[in-house]
């Protein structure tokens, strides 16, 4: 049976100012602190069932420790390990409990250096009394901060996106949903998923020529009014909203608001809307160079090439 990826699981970040990063993600964004292991703090949104969807660890510079994907079956982890090794990829085994709340996993790097993790076994702790939702199909009751529902996607940049698109398709079963093709034929970005979401991962070209960078990761809010409320909360705490405010992407049809963690500089997208794909024979949507601006910004603040939105952090 072919090994399959089920979903985007979590992202593990290194931050040079752990205290400020925890303040931002826990107290302002409204993620729940679930657990601690040494200096690492594990968090999740009120609708996330798995042990954590974000971990924060102190370090001397901001970088991504790993981007994690959950498989559909327990045996898929071993199968992925064997397939990757057969193709010459170095695979590191992570023992149960080495990452709090998680079973046996593998870590490896893509050809351009992205650090990935694949796992299946994971704890799903219940919310403590006093935070538990009265709705049996929720984990926590949303009670403070921006309070996104769940983790959504990750967006990474590299020098040649097409190579990574093909690698993800061939090795992990991702499907292309939308992409940008320039006049010279170069594919500048692609939005891919293994779920019905319009994207679980976006891979785009880095205009600075860096091979393995994190542009942002995203948490999902239920509706656009939550995005507007998030903007108010950020401004009340004197946190800069990138590009000056929220807007809507043409690609993915999603509403967005971008903000950097003041402790690390890692960029967070607060994301709402989008669309789901159920067609097994989906034809990827091509955006051409003359349509690029509408694809990136359907309406809202202008995203200027060479501006602050080109900033990324290390993978």
From Swiss-Prot:
Write one Gene Ontology MF term.
Answer: metal ion binding
Activity sensitivity to pH: Optimum pH is 7.5.
The chain positions of domain VOC read: 7-121, 150-273
The alphabetized list of GO BP terms reads: catabolic process
Question: Do you know which PROSITE patterns this protein is assigned to?
Answer: VOC
Q: How does activity depend on temperature?
A: Optimum temperature is 85 degrees Celsius.
* Pathway terms, separated by semicolons: Xenobiotic degradation; biphenyl degradation; 2-hydroxy-2,4-pentadienoate and benzoate from biphenyl: step 3/4
Claim: Repeat is one of the keywords in the record: yes
- What does the note accompanying the cofactor annotation read? Binds 1 Mn(2+) ion per subunit.
Q: Which reaction does it catalyse?
A: biphenyl-2,3-diol + O2 = 2-hydroxy-6-oxo-6-phenylhexa-2,4-dienoate + H(+)
Please name the top-level EC class of this enzyme: oxidoreductase
For the ligand (Mn(2+)), the binding residues are: 153, 216, 269
> What EC number(s) are associated with this protein in UniProt?
1.13.11.39
What keyword terms does UniProt attach to this protein?
Answer: Aromatic hydrocarbons catabolism, Dioxygenase, Manganese, Metal-binding, Oxidoreductase, Repeat
Its job: Catalyzes the meta-cleavage of the hydroxylated biphenyl ring. The enzyme can oxidize a wide range of substrates, and the substrate preference order is 2,3-dihydroxybiphenyl > 3-methylcatechol > catechol > 4-methylcatechol > 4-chlorocatechol.
What subunit structure does UniProt give?
Homotetramer.
Record-given protein name:
Manganese-dependent 2,3-dihydroxybiphenyl 1,2-dioxygenase
What gene name does this entry carry? bphC
């Amino acid at each position: 049976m072919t090994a399959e990826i089920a979903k985007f699981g979590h992202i593990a970040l290194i931050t040079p100012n752990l205290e400020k990063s925890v303040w931002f993600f826990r107290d302002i964004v409204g993620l729940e602190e679930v657990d601690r292991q040494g200096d690492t703090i594990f968090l999740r949104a009120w609708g996330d069932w798995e042990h954590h969807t974000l971990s924060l660890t102190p370090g001397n510079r901001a970088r991504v420790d790993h981007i994690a994907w959950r498989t559909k079956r327990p045996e898929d982890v071993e199968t992925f390990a064997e397939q990757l090794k057969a193709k010459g990829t170095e695979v590191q085994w992570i023992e149960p409990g080495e990452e709090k709340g998680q079973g046996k996993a593998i870590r490896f790097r893509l050809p351009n250096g992205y650090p990935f993790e694949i796992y299946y076994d994971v704890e799903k702790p219940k919310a403590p009394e006093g935070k538990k939702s009265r709705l049996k199909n929720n984990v926590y009751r949303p009670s403070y901060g921006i309070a996104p529902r769940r983790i959504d996607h990750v967006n990474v940049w590299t020098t040649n996106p097409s190579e990574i698109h093909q690698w993800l398709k061939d090795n992990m079963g991702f499907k292309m949903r939308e992409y940008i093709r320039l006049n010279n034929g170069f594919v500048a970005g692609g939005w891919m998923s293994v779920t019905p979401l319009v994207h679980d991962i976006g891979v785009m070209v880095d205009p600075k020529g860096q091979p393995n960078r994190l542009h942002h990761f995203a948490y999902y809010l239920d509706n656009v009014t939550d995005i507007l409320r998030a903007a108010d909360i950020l401004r009340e705490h004197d946190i800069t909203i990138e590009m000056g405010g929220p807007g809507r992407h043409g690609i993915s049809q999603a509403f967005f608001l971008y903000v950097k963690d003041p402790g690390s500089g890692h960029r967070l997208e607060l994301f709402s809307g989008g669309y789901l794909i159920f067609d097994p024979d989906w034809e990827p949507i091509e955006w051409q160079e003359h349509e690029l601006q509408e694809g990136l910004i359907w309406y809202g603040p202008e995203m200027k090439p060479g501006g602050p939105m080109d900033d990324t952090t290390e993978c």
